[in-house]
Amino acid sequence: MNQQASFQQEEWGIGGTKNEVNRTIAISMGDDMKFKPEKINIKVGETIRFEIKNNGKLLHEMVIGTKQVLDKHAEMMVKHPNMEHDEPYMAHISPGKKGEIIWKFNRAGSFDFACLIAGHYQAGMVGKIEVQQ
C-alpha cells in the first residue's frame, strides 16, 4: 500500500518528501546564536532538504515561516518553554546532533527561519530565505 504524507499548505510552502528533493543545503547552528549560512536563495518549486547540525551545547531548533508567524510562536515559547510542537517546517536538535527538514517552496517571497527556544530568537538567532521565480 502506498501511503502519501498529508501536508498542509502554508504561506511559505508545504512539507516535502525525500523523493521530491531537488537539493540539500547544510545548515549549522550553535551557542553563538547564529545560523550558517544566514541567507539562502531558492527557486520557486524547489524541494529542499535542510541538513541541520547543532554544534552547540544547548538545545536549538530551526523553524521556517513568515516573520509574523515566527514572532507569534516565539512569544508563545517564552510563556510556555516546554510546549510540545512538531510541524514539518521545524526541527529540534539536541547538542552535537543532526536533524533535517524537507520543505517544498512553492510560493515566491521573503521568508525567515529561526530558533524559537526562549531567549534564542530574541538574541538574533534568525536567517532569511529568498524564494524567487
What is each of the regions a protein language model found here?
Residues 1, 60, 73, 120:
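Histidine-centered active-site/metal-ligand motif
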Residues 1-17:
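N-terminal low-complexity, Pro/Thr/Ser-rich intrinsically disordered segments
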Residues 2-6, 34, 87-133:
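Extracellular/periplasmic metallocenter environments
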Residues 27, 38-64, 99-107:
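Beta-strand cores of secreted/periplasmic/IMS beta-sandwich domains, seen most often
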Residues 68-79:
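Short aromatic-acidic-glycine turn motif
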Residues 12, 17-47:
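N-terminal edge beta-strand
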Residues 78-86:
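Short beta-strand and strand-turn-strand segments in soluble, beta-rich domains
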Residues 22, 59, 122-126:
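Short edge beta-strand segments in beta-sheet-rich domains
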